[in-house]
Amino acid sequence: MKIKLLIIITAITLSQLVATDFTITRLKYGGGGDWYSDPSSLPNLLDFLQNETNIKTASKEIKASIGSSDFYNNSYYYITGHGKINFSNNEINILRDVLLNGAFLHADDNYGMDQSFREEMKKVFPEKDWVELPHDHEIF
């Protein structure tokens, strides 16, 4: 009986450690672009998800540099700004690895980031070309 109780308590404890609220990681980056711009965008998105879906969300975003310990606490990444992005070679390799393993990168050009973002992503995926998805693509 004591062993069964110990197993149940352990299972409940572990499930609580694993059961985390959905959140989004805002990527910090070098290059002069303002990675911190539009500070209300992610809280608003998380609030919308909480109120309009069955997804339990965290109240705050995570802010992390690529490769930092906080970076690995999530798989939904958000990048925004008004200027140049510059990833180091190490950041390029890490970003490639996480994206190839199922992570999602949400890019939001607040004006002026588009060209730089495309150039940096070409370094992440040099073998890939940008393609426009048709409106009837299954993702929509």
Regions found by a protein language model. Give the residues of each.
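Sec-dependent N-terminal signal peptides
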Residues: 3-14
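Short alpha-beta junction capping motif
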Residues: 24, 76-115
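Surface-exposed patches in mature extracellular/periplasmic domains of secreted proteins
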Residues: 56-64, 107-110, 128-135
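Extracytoplasmic/secreted proteins, especially bacterial periplasmic and envelope-associated proteins
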Residues: 40-44, 48, 90, 94, ...
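Sec-exported extracytoplasmic/periplasmic mature domains
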Residues: 50-54, 100, 122-126
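Aromatic-Pro/Gly-enriched surface loop or interdomain linker
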Residues: 17-76, 80-83
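Intrinsically disordered, low-complexity boundary segments flanking structured domains
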Residues: 9-11, 64-66, 119
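An acidic, glycine-rich "communication" segment
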Residues: 22, 28-32, 40-41, 113-140
